[in-house]
Amino acid sequence: MAAETDTTLPELRETVASLPTGPGIYQFKNSAGKVIYVGKAKNIRSRVRSYFRDPRQLTGKTQVLVGHITDLEIIITSSEVEALILENNLIKELKPRYNVNLKDDKTYPWLVITGEPFPRVFISRNRTRDKSTWFGPYTEAGQLRSILELIGSIFPVRSCRYSLTPENIAAKKHKLCLDYHIGKCKGPCEGLQNEAEYLEMIGEIVRLLKGRTAGLLKELHEKMLTAAAELRFEEAAELKMQLQSLRRYADRQKMVAADGMDRDVSAIASGDDEACGVVFRIREGKMLGARHFILTNTAGEPEKKLLGKVLEGYYLKSPEAMPEEVLLSAQLDLEDTESLQALSREREEECPTRRKAVKFTVPQIGEKAHLVEMCRQNARHHLAEYLVQKQKRGEAAREHYGVKALGESLHLETPPKRIECFDNSHLQGTDYVSSMVCFVNGKPLKSAYRKFRLQSLEEACGTGSSDDYAAMEQVLGRRYGGSLQDELPLPDLIVVDGGKGQANSAKKVLDRLGITVPVIGLAKRLEEVFTPDADGPFNLPKTSPALKLLQQLRDEAHRFAITYHRNIRSKRTLETGLTTIPGVGEKIAFALLERFGSVDGVAAASAEELSQFAGKVKGMSIFRHYHP
């Protein structure tokens, strides 16, 4: 298990870095491709990244889970609620190993309007196929109860279980209950409200549950303001709660369709020569999963042709019958439509309960259009992820080839996987620094970068001369003979910026320390490669991957050295010019330089100018420093 984790986690961390930051669900898979865990997230990237932090911060069960992860897949949603619904559906469908006993596998509740003459409205978790109208499912039972209470407070709908047939009402079989006496029911049980009036009220409730809430929101808001103005604060507070509940309901999740239909949704995202198609699988109004397909060599292909290829590939491999409806991002070609209808007719023999032809539609507005757009959003994500991985594979191949080519060009026994490169920087013998950069498998390993500071060339060389060779010896001695020899592993190749003299200086240090690491020098002007044992340089072809890798190393070492040198020089300038003044720190010194242009500009400023900029006390201190 440990070996599997060590090889898998770096690849997964790269995948995690490209994940979106919006809501959705993620599925972890094992080496057999089986989903072993499904989770939801407000921020997919942040949540998934948390699994790959320091194992000591994870629970024992999570560590075991992470040890089995070899791949992951996500589905983007429009809201956290949609992610919650989808997570519940997928856990029920897939029964992932590591979700067992971790999730409450209850069935989400529905709101039911019965098909009786005087319909009742209530909550149920067990959906049945009868004449009732079902709304939901809802993710929060508490919110659903609030909606039911809201309906009861606005509409006098009956709560009793009486069988209100015309015969029972005429026979006065049922008596008025408490709800009638407190104004929550109009008494249809005794014929005090007719069926037509009652059904009209039920129609209003249905419109409310379908999201037509604007008028009701306005009415409740006006009632709340009136109650507050008349000092009926308790009633106003209750109306405010009803208003908040209704607003939450108006924003109910869109992933689950109230009609409970079986349908698939498919959309395409296209690049220059690649495309991605996604298929959402929705059953009984609930989305149970998604699949994506990468298509190559797609330049010039219309979206409808790509959709046809995706759907044919999907349904040919799908073991179940096609759904009643397929929502699309573009209209299919007639030929593709006919072939899919033919495939559907074949599958009907295995599913004789459904005889309707499949309906292929391209919705323009409403919830169906929302589902298509969400599907396209997922397609865009998968395509972007594919293109990033493709680019990384290409870069990795080039980097690997560069390392291999360099090893062959230098006649090394093995490719130099770890390379360290040194560069010196100074200004007329002052602020002398050296940098070391490290590349592993052709890529910078910045955690292994090091910088060295020498106070002067005299110290670097041990003499009064300006001997860059001796300076290089000093730096290499500190890297391979000092404390760093235990901190960092030895490289497979050492590169120094310079010609044969620098290469020989480096070799002298390594011989003295008993280190047998190959060393070369790379001269800037002609890009010549020098080795200590050769009489002269040799040149690599200008297009050689080996030369490109050496140039990248040398340029990175030079950049690192120059940056360090500039920082030291800037700090020294501040220390010698401004930070020696009492009360002037680095922050104020930089601000003064920005305001007056230079140290000379600060010295030439008047007491009034300095006081206005730095304050009276500090301003006068700076002025007296230059004008004692």
UniProtKB/Swiss-Prot annotation:
Residue stretches making up the UVR domain? 214-249
Q: Give me the disulphide-bonded residues.
A: none
Please state the gene responsible for encoding this protein. uvrC
What would be one Gene Ontology cellular-component term for the protein? cytoplasm
Its localization reads: Cytoplasm
Q: What is its main location?
A: cytoplasm
Can you name this protein? Answer: UvrABC system protein C
Q: How does it assemble?
A: Interacts with UvrB in an incision complex.
Enumerate the NCBIfam families for this protein.
Answer: PRK00558.1-5, uvrC
- Keyword Transferase assigned to the entry: answer is no
